Amino acid sequence: QLDLRKYDLIMSSSHAFAKGILTSPDQLHISYVHTPMRYAWDQMYTYLKQSKLSKIGFEFPIRLMLYKLREWDFYSSQRLDYVISNSNFTSKRIKKYWGLESEVIHPPVDIKRFNYKNSRGNFYISLNRLVPNKRVDLLIKAFNKLNLPLIIIGDGPERLKLEKISNSNIKFLRKISDKEVEKYMSRCKAFVY
């Protein structure tokens, strides 16, 4: 437990637990929310289906735990003084699951980092964590069908599975520097998310 009693203003950046910090009535708590917990709300069954624990007989206790987590997520959100969301989509999720209004402030991007090149490469790019909820598998299926060149930058537990379903037009890059990301972003035909 963090001791935040000496601060008048608490700002949290949260997709799960940071917004749940306990504050006093004298403190103002502003939370920048990336999403209400997906695994406790609309994507619970997707996460359960993909969980190794549910495959070995733990689905019921996990489901019970996720329902309790959903309750906590809701009640902890009600203690926030002001909510900022990172997108219109997240704002709708906050309204739906927490019943709260939020102001949208998109994450900042220093666009000067990305030098536009007149000579574009003949490839598309995706920058992602390779996890189930990002649905990179759908992107791969589309690019397999279109046979267009795609570079996927990122890593995660789904990488090997995604590499197996990819045709030769799709290339994976892991752990590359920010400078290399900038180079690919400035040369690609389009960014795909």
Task: Mark where each language-model region is.
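Conserved donor-binding/catalytic core segment of Leloir-type glycosyltransferases
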Residues: 109, 115-151
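An anion/phosphate-binding loop that grips the pyrophosphate of nucleotide cofactors and donors
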Residues: 7, 80, 188
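Membrane-proximal helix-turn-helix segments that form the acceptor-binding/catalytic region
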Residues: 50-83, 91
